[in-house]
Amino acid sequence: VLFEYMETIWNNSPILRDICDGNSGPRRDVDRCVMRINDSRVTCLPLGDGQKIRGQRANDIISDEFASIPRDIFETVVAGFAAVSSDPIENVKRLAAEKKAKELGVEIQDKDDNKLEDKDNQIILSGTAYYDFNHFATYWKRWKSIIKSQGDPTKLREVFGGEDVPDNFDWKEYSIMRIPYELLPEGFMDASQVARSKATVHAGIYQMEFGACFTRD
């Protein structure tokens, strides 16, 4: 679905196509779909059992319809895509320099202008809400607890099951967004179909599909 949106944007944007090089644009292959915009690349992969996509690397991961992705495949395969730094060699050099400077008592001034470039790899979990027992709901609750902790060590220790909080953990790097039907721009969805669903389907299913709520069975 995401790749189809990319194709639509590309096909309907003549100015975008004009400012991109000849290698840019969407491409569908047997085992993947790739969208290139100059030096940037988006790769869409079919998960399967996870074996054929092992070893992939990514700066940013979007796991769409997360409730339908087997938890073990996400945690053992997909999440590992972002385990390596976006520029591992430069990152190793920078950390080594900072460590040595600290030993020598030399202060290294932060480069505020490059804060966006220094951001760690990102993972986005998205999709339609599902039942409360699903791992999507589990992740949502965990991330919400992290955000509500406001960095309090005691509360974070509870989130981590009583274990110490990792040294490089930053609660500010987590966010959650809930977008129910009522917050969408008017006309974005067929209002009559939404009304029909609200009148005919189970309230729990309606809340999952249109209310962005995890439902208990």
Language model regions located:
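Residues immediately C-terminal
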Residues: 49, 68-69
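Phosphate/oxyanion-binding active-site loops and adjacent basic polyanion-contact surfaces
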Residues: 2-3, 70-74
